[in-house]
Amino acid sequence: MYEMAYDIKKKLDVNFKTLNGLIKYHNSVLEEYHTKILSKKLDKTEYKLKEKWKELDDKLKNTLKINPLNSEYKLQKEGMYMKHCVGGYTKSVKTGKSYIFSIYYEDKPYTCELTMKKDIININQLYGRFNTIAPDALYKLIGDTIKQSQERIMKDETII
């Protein structure tokens, strides 16, 4: 939410007392963000994938049929369609801090953000439309694919 507010030059007002209040405030910032972003032309140029993500990118595409969200345009469109804040992660994807993709599971769309700390890949976020919680089975499916990729990297003694 911070990056969205920063991008639209909005001062955050953290005057809520309940989880419901936080969700309502998040959604109002998100709506304002989408409205302002829609008014500017989005860059469709795909970001160059950082080396540390390349092997996993191939594995995920071939195994799970994912759609990488690797441009400002794709991230914003995903956020608008899914009604969540993935559009605010443009900088994080561009710099390689995050690897974000969309995936369909049981005919429902989900958005997943992966991050890496000390060569360990983590599922940082995995949400459906309107920030609905993803099924445990999808977490397991993605996690198993990541684990297979990491085991291969360790076996080859390749450092990411």
Summary of predicted features, one role per range:
Residues M1-I160:
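Glycine-focused motif/segment detector
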